[in-house]
């Protein structure tokens, strides 16, 4: 079984020659590199949670329907799946550091574009930001693993905390920022371009200094897309991600419909996301010690889904308890879905390709969740009717979580093109 440092999937595993870590002559330059990577990670989630807490204001300000709002929350998730496959090839051609620089540029522009406040600028900004985040999602774990091989476990923890911290910060602070900016929801959305721009300035000299030899793919993996286990891993990734992006996109509006104030709803979502950190860090070390991860996966699905259903029907006094349960379940599912990719793969090349399959198909599947919730709300005028849909997601994720958790490898073969 892989040990803790092997959790991160290297998207450039097939590259020939393999990418090498940059030369860092001083401890300070190494600390700066680590800090920069963590800060990049922190900017990969505010796009989602900042929209969520302002969705009622966006609907009122633009006149869009709940269905159109569902499309707005869905667009970045679709982009996660659509653009993820391009990241490894771009890294082979230009180097991961320079691609991450482009990620920050596009992310800053896309986030700032939301400040225009028009219907189409919101959609365009969501698309650009989603495309950038897709690239960052794929490349950043491999860069962390490559540049910090001796401290991969610590960097994995910091990387995970940064992802959750960025999402939680946007959920918790966007409403206060809106109030500080005179009640302007569009400026509050655009505000999150500032931290992305600051990290861009920090990363720019490091990216330009990096040396890169043009690489090509020296390996191919055959049989993966026909393998039932690979599809079970992919469906598990997609269905648990669907629940996650429903939380990002719709939990705050659900809480506001149930009677919470905008600030309190944002604070509760932020609290729930921070609860994800605990199981994000703990589940991998627990999972690798088990022959099968099936029970863990099913248990986490129950926590995440039942708590989400509880927000629809249970009294308001229970919401903070539900937030903890949902955060524990969802955070564990994020880690578990990534772990089964590694554990079901016989080698690093298969893991990279299985990760690509799970992200490409899984995120497109995940995008259906927020869209369906928007459709249900548009048709019924209430979120209460979404409960049945949440149950369907729960059952689907549990079945595929159980199947993908079994101790076996996907039936795919790695072929060395150079041999």
Describe each model-derived feature in a short phrase.
Residues 291-337:
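C-terminal transmembrane helical hairpin of 12-TM major facilitator-type secondary transporters
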Residues 83-95, 279-292:
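Helix-to-loop junctions at the C-terminal end of transmembrane segments
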Residues 126-161:
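Cytoplasmic helix-loop-helix junction between adjacent transmembrane helices
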Residues 49, 77-85, 168, 273-281, ...:
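Residue-level signature of mid-helix packing/kink "hotspots" within the transmembrane helices
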Residues 119, 150-151, 157-207:
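Helix-loop-helix hairpin linking two adjacent transmembrane segments in secondary transporters
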């Amino acid at each position: 079984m892989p040990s803790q440092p092997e959790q991160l999937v290297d998207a450039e595993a097939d590259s020939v020659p393999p990418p090498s870590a940059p030369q860092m002559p001083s401890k300070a330059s190494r600390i700066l590199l680590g800090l920069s990577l963590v800060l990049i990670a922190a900017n990969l989630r505010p796009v989602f949670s900042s929209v969520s807490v302002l969705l009622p204001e966006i609907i009122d300000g633009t006149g869009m329907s709940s269905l159109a709002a569902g499309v707005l929350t869905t667009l970045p998730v679709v982009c996660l799946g659509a653009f993820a496959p391009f990241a490894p090839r771009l890294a082979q051609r230009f180097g991961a550091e320079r691609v991450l620089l482009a990620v920050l540029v596009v992310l800053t522009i896309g986030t700032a574009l939301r400040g225009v406040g028009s219907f189409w600028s919101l959609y365009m900004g969501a698309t650009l930001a989603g495309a950038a985040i897709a690239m960052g999602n794929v490349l950043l774990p491999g860069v962390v693993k490559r540049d910090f091989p001796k401290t991969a476990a610590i960097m994995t923890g910091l990387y995970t905390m940064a992802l959750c911290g960025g999402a939680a910060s946007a959920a918790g602070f966007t409403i206060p920022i809106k109030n500080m900016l005179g009640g302007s929801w569009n400026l509050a959305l655009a505000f999150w371009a500032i931290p992305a721009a600051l990290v861009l300035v920090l990363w720019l000299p490091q990216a330009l200094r990096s040396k890169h030899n043009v690489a090509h793919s020296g390996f191919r993996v055959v049989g993966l897309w026909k393998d039932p286990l690979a599809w079970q891993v992919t469906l598990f990734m997609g269905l648990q991600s669907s629940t996650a992006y429903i939380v990002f996109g719709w939990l705050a509006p659900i809480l506001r419909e149930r009677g919470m104030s905008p600030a309190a709803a944002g604070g509760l979502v932020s609290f729930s996301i921070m609860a994800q950190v605990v199981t994000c860090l703990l589940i991998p070390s627990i999972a690798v010690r088990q022959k099968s991860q099936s029970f863990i996966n099913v248990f986490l699905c129950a926590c995440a889904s039942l708590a989400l259903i509880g927000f629809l029907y249970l009294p308001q006094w229970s919401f903070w308890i539900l937030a903890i349960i949902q955060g524990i379940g969802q955070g564990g599912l994020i880690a578990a879905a990534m772990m089964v990719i590694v554990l079901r793969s016989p080698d690093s090349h298969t893991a990279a390709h299985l990760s690509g399959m799970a992200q490409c198909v899984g995120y497109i599947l995940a995008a259906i969740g927020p869209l369906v919730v928007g459709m249900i709300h548009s048709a019924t005028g209430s979120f209460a009717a979404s409960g049945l849909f949440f149950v369907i997601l729960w059952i689907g994720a549990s079945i595929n979580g159980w199947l993908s958790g079994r101790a076996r490898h996907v039936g795919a073969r790695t072929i060395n093109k150079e041999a």
